[in-house]
A protein has these predicted regions:
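Amphipathic, charge-rich alpha-helical segments that serve as recognition/docking helices
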Residues: 10-22, 26, 31-32, 52-118
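Short active-site oxyanion
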Residues: 41-45
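Short, conserved phosphate/pyrophosphate- and ester-handling motifs at nucleotide-, phospho-/glycolipid
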Residues: 49
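N-terminal BTB/POZ boundary and linker segment
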Residues: 34-38
Length: 118
């Protein structure tokens, strides 16, 4: 099994699943015998798929793949995580506001970094 790094700040951007949602996800993965969607990584650090990866730790026989994405920096990665999470249907209004705020902060930092480079 590939050992991926878990970044607490990245993981914090991902709203937790309810117990029922987590159990359903685990059942689906076990039924398929593999992950249907690859885990998203940046420099060997998990960006998307934290819940699936946690399930894989309990079931190392399950096949999975990873898709590496390129980001210039942590802020760009956080902005991507927030945009991706905002596409989820089960977010509460509070979770949406939090993610929008974090996305805005991260994109503002990215813009500042690129402005200083030019």
């Amino acid at each position: 099994m590939i050992n991926l790094k878990i970044d607490p700040e990245f993981q914090k951007q991902i709203p937790p699943l309810t117990d029922d949602e987590y159990k359903q996800l685990e059942e689906n993965i076990l039924k398929e015998g593999k992950l249907l969607s690859p885990l998203i990584v940046w420099n060997s650090t998990l960006v998307d798929g934290h819940n699936r990866y946690a399930i894989l730790q309990q079931h190392p026989e399950i096949y999975f793949s990873t898709t590496p994405l390129h980001f210039e920096n942590r802020e760009e990665t956080i902005a991507w995580i927030c945009r991706n999470q905002l596409g989820r249907r089960n977010l509460s209004p509070e979770q949406k506001r939090y993610l929008l705020g974090k996305q805005y902060e991260a994109e503002k930092k990215v813009a500042k970094i690129f402005r200083f480079r030019t």
